[in-house]
Amino acid sequence: MNFLDLLKEKVVIFDGAMGSNLQALDLSIDDWGGPQFENCSENLLYTRPDAIEKVHSSFLDVGCDVIETNSFGGSEVVLAEFGIAEKTYDVNRKAAELARRIAGDYSTSDKPRFVAGSIGPGTKLPTLGHITYNNLKAAYREQVRGLYDGGSDLFIVETCQDLLQTKAALAAIFELFEERKVKIPVIAQVTIEVFGTMLNGTEIGAALTALEPFPIDVIGMNCGTGPKHMSDSFRYLCENSPLPVSVLPNAGLPEVKDGQQHYDETPESFAAQVDHFAKDFGANIVGGCCGTSPEHLKQVVERVGGLSPKRRGAKLVPAASSIYFQQPFTQD
């Protein structure tokens, strides 16, 4: 069974946070590879791959169907900030190989496990003039190649804050497909902030209109906020997207308590809201983002693990989009 077959059969459950669960391991400066690499989780692939393996295994242990590679910050743009841009291909290949090996250890004929090659937004957004579109697309190429060559079953372009950034990542993926004459599934996920749009002001309707024409397999939302603040935008996506839809919320909004970042959604409250997204809105893929622990995902698996996808009957509104708004093609 491949990933798209599984998506037709059940609500697919992705893993939770990599970063906050690595932080919970209380790694030393030496573990990170020195002060210059602190919080560069990709460098742990060289210094403490066992820590990455521990996080992956913790989510597979509770029943998640898909784990994401430890490559969210693995683009050439981000790695250049740590002085390791030349390792971009190797970092991403290692991340995918490690995840693929662990997923293989857990996979059975009755419960296959899959690896999603994670591609984050990076630190430079073209719409804000930080980087040109062409340079950003070029920076994604080595990441995409490494994730594919390492054995990723699908790509997930996630936490997208800028439609041009999203398109650059997707273009790099589809160029690889054309070059290699291959195809694996692609998910595109945008981040809607508490003020109701993407970081640069794009509303969810404009994001759907702009991204749906790409040959992606799933469109969705992740990060930014907890499930409460995602509800209206995700409902819109479920009611209007002809594609399968995904939602991977944070464990609420972060706040600092006693010098530590804390998220306010308990595993039980988080799972209840994710269950609502699947049963009532028709989410095809659920999972967690920042602050979500294996316990959060265990509760999600218990509530959602046996669900079949809900028929949504969504109908895409013919429209054009600017960087900010959707303009439907309607006549009076």
Residue ranges: model-predicted function:
Residues M1-D332:
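Domain-level signal for soluble alpha/beta catalytic cores
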